[in-house]
A protein has these predicted regions:
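Residues at the starts of beta-strands that form the adenosine-phosphate
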Residues: 3, 28, 114, 141, ...
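Interdomain hinge/lid region at the active-site interface
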Residues: 207-275
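Internal alpha-helical scaffold of NAD(P)-dependent oxidoreductase catalytic cores
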Residues: 134-220
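Rossmann-like NAD(P)(H) cofactor-binding subdomain of soluble oxidoreductases
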Residues: 77-130
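Rossmann-like NAD(P)-binding element
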Residues: 56-85, 89-90
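Glycine-rich, N-terminal phosphate-binding loop of Rossmann-like dinucleotide-binding domains
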Residues: 68-70, 95, 146
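NAD(P)+-binding Rossmann beta1-loop-alpha1 motif at the extreme N-terminus of oxidoreductases
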Residues: 1-60
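Conserved acidic residues
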Residues: 49, 63, 188
Length: 298
């Protein structure tokens, strides 16, 4: 690969820059970002990139194009770069939902140009190039989306690319992807936002100062709820059907917990708590986290 264009130099985009540069995967790294603040930070950090003022300039000089923006920006980006795309371009993204975004891309992408979607399962509640890390993708899953008309050469190339990023590769359909992550990612974020809002509402109604006592559960949820609001709005809207079903399951279980608490059903509630505790052990066994108490991030 000669050159890569990264559209959006925030947390993920800047982490890609750092990794690509360290591993010498591309000769040149072009970056486009409509945020003047992000560009100023990129310059200040002296990231090894060529900042392009025009998307078209970046596309014309690149082999690989990676969308690292909120998904609501995909359509406008495609419409701007369509005229400069050719069949040699490999185009992908890092978006967290796939059905709606893929439909939007395909509807607006010019004919005979292929879109192959990626989802590296990593991130943080913070955003901006100053938070990027070259090892952000190391030992993390990266989902590649395979469809009937997927260009297999592009899929193979992206598998190799993400392995160089340090990722473990899994291939699945966009439908399976959105169902899985509605439960493992999208619902937990929604619950975090709602829990923090509930604390705010309670604090306002009771006139208690709750926040200063947030050393336990609320603190952990508040970290998740600090995630980028535009990105998560897009995810909630794009994967609304699966998320709505996930909410139904959550509400059903919440009502069951409420019933057990009110009736002091010792056997039922202990059974639930023990079963759910086992999930944590399984996550550690699968090396998705470490068996170490977390009293605050470093």
């Amino acid at each position: 690969m000669n050159n890569v264009l990264i559209i959006g130099c925030g947390l993920l985009g800047s982490s890609l820059v750092r990794r690509i540069s360290k591993k010498k995967i591309a000769k040149k790294i072009f970056v486009y970002d409509k945020s003047k603040l992000n560009l100023a930070k990129t310059r200040k950090l002296k990231l090894p990139v060529i900042i392009v003022k025009s998307l078209n300039d970046g596309v014309a000089n690149s082999d690989l194009i990676i969308f690292c923006t909120p998904m609501s920006e995909y359509k406008n980006i495609i419409l701007k770069i369509n005229k400069d795309l050719n069949q040699k371009h490999i185009i992908t993204d890092v978006g967290s939902s796939k059905i709606k975004s893929s439909e939007t891309i395909k509807k607006n992408l010019k004919k005979k140009i292929f879109w192959t979607s990626s989802h590296p399962i990593t991130g943080s509640e913070v955003s901006g190039p100053e938070y990027g890390k070259q090892d952000l993708f190391v030992n993390k899953w990266c989902v590649l989306i395979k469809e009937k008309k997927t260009n297999l050469k592009h899929l193979k190339f992206l598998g190799s690319f993400w392995k160089k990023m340090g990722s473990k590769i899994v291939i699945m359909s966009k439908e399976k992807h959105d169902k899985i992550f509605s439960i493992t990612s999208h619902l937990p974020h929604l619950v975090a936002y709602n829990l923090v809002k509930s604390a705010q509402d309670f604090e306002k109604k009771q006139k208690f100062n709750l926040i200063k006592y947030s050393a336990g559960g609320l603190r952990d949820f508040s970290r998740i709820a600090a995630s980028n609001e535009i990105m998560w709005r897009d995810i909630f809207f794009d994967n609304k059907n699966n998320i709505s079903k996930a909410i139904d399951i959550f509400v059903k279980n919440l009502k069951a917990f409420k019933k057990d608490i009110n009736s002091k059903n010792n056997k039922s509630i202990l059974n639930k708590l023990i079963k759910t505790k086992k999930v944590r052990a399984k996550i550690i066994k699968l090396k998705q986290d470490i068996n170490k108490p977390d009293f605050g991030r470093n």
